[in-house]
């Protein structure tokens, strides 16, 4: 009967006890668009940008740090890596700050949720997490994560917006997931919404990826040129001096 009534991926989901379309599944994906590290040479790809997003958790949740690459003209995204911090460690940012200070990601813009500005909430100190990260000279985007504005300029924080965009891109194959992001794939495979519109838990990895995608859609990602902020500033100064020299010739 399963073979007669359901498609192959629906049969697999039912046998595994996973939600499928029609019973609240958010990502009814049979073949996830995954890739392996090394499949894409992001540093050599023209116009590629990148951003880091953080979903913050306390003792019973996870803190998830996502690195995403983005092609603004092709509207393609790559969820390249996720660092998942669980348990007591996530309440202390010193346990994961080193992931943000690594040379290969230092200087990458970091986007945070609104409550990252709450003093002591995620730091157990007199600093907010935003202030804590800024004290390490990290490139923290000044505004909290939000949905892109509508055509009339109105801004909302409706969660379903980012989820729906992510689902559509996954279905089209323009949102690719590094196969190492198993936490995301596990959460997304089991992600569902109830009749009242409430999304299931856990969704920390999904939310972190959603924040990164929203940052890309807002135009907050920055070009991936392999430079540090200091090198970018030096290059900008050289460019300005060159322009001035030409004007005075």
Where are these regions (language model features)?
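A conserved active-site cap/scaffold subdomain adjacent to cofactor or substrate pockets
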Residues: 51-54, 58, 62-64, 79-81
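Short beta-strand scaffold segments in enzyme catalytic cores
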Residues: 63-68, 210
